[in-house]
């Protein structure tokens, strides 16, 4: 019987690792309080309540797509000094853009750096010995950054860490939202899309505009691009793994949350294994019903091919 195991964060939590995003919240708050404040200020625009901010961390990757860019612009306008101001200096050509970059870079670069150091600490925690029976000859698709499969279960082959492995310093850990950013158009793109006459009219209309504003929009656009999880690209880069699943007869899903962000991977698994039996873990009764709904109505798995079990 050829098997595929799909491993989610609940697998590490089951083994006692403090790997929830709530734990990451505490880590960020201690190690970079300024970043913590920026996350809760700009990534949860709909509410200021403590309960709502906890929800932000519960669905942290999705929350990266909640950037309140209007609030970000309002903040940066404090650094947008009018041309001809009595105190004008050349540095004012860049203060608006710099204030935007400081925040967007912290929500991208600093956040990812801190994620890696946190996972490195998590990965040092010795997992408890409540082992789950696993088939060493199976294939493994892991959504975790940690080495629990390798260290506790002594598995070493046929494991794809689809979002990266913390020990691989040469690759970036994949983290992001699912909102595909709109393509940004360069001045050359705009020029090529118009007739010469229309382009001259366009330039005349923009003649009085502040170029710092346009540069600021590029900075915000870069945030959306850099924080986007391009699942199609990730699948394409790992197509060899998915193409090798055609003979899989059983799929064992352990500790996966079935986040909408990651459903593209599961669609690809289903495409390769249309007749496989699914054995799926859940933690709460609410999850049990939600997972069944996703499997049947979104992924198209036949109901008689699904078994759910409590973990």
Report residues per predicted region.
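SIR2/sirtuin-family catalytic core signature
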Residues: 1-15, 237-311
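Short, electropositive, low-hydrophobicity segments enriched in small/polar residues
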Residues: 12-14, 20, 168, 180, ...
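Short, charged, surface-exposed secondary-structure boundary motifs
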Residues: 168-178, 288-292
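Active-site periphery "cap/insert" segments of enzyme catalytic domains
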Residues: 23, 28-171, 238-254, 259-274, ...
């Amino acid at each position: 019987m050829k098997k595929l195991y799909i491993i989610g964060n609940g697998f590490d939590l089951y083994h006692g690792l403090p790997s929830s995003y709530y734990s990451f919240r505490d880590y960020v708050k201690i190690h970079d309080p300024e970043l913590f404040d920026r996350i809760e200020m700009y990534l949860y625009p709909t509410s200021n309540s403590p309960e709502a901010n906890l929800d932000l961390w519960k669905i942290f990757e999705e929350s990266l797509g909640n950037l309140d860019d209007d609030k970000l612009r309002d903040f940066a306008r404090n650094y947008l000094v009018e041309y001809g101001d009595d105190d004008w200096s050349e540095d004012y050509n860049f203060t608006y853009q710099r204030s935007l970059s400081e925040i967007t870079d912290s929500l991208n670069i600093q956040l990812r750096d801190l994620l890696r150091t946190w996972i490195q600490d998590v990965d040092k925690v010795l997992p408890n010995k409540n082992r789950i029976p696993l088939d060493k000859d199976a294939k493994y698709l892991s959504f975790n950054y940690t080495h629990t499969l390798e260290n506790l279960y002594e598995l070493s082959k046929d494991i794809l860490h689809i979002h990266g492995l913390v020990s691989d310093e040469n690759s970036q850990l994949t983290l992001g939202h699912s909102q595909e950013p709109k393509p940004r158009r360069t001045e050359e793109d705009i020029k090529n899309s118009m007739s010469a006459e229309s382009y001259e009219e366009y330039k005349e209309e923009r003649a009085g505009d502040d170029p710092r504003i346009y540069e600021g929009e590029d900075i915000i656009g870069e945030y959306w691009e850099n924080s986007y999880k391009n699942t199609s690209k990730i699948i394409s880069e790992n197509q060899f793994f998915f193409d090798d699943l055609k003979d899989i007869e059983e799929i064992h899903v352990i500790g996966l949350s079935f986040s909408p962000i990651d459903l593209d991977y599961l669609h690809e698994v289903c495409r390769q294994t249309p007749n496989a039996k699914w054995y799926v873990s859940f933690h709460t009764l609410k999850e049990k019903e939600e997972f069944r709904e996703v499997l049947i109505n979104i992924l198209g798995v036949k109901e008689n091919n699904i078994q759910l079990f409590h973990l």
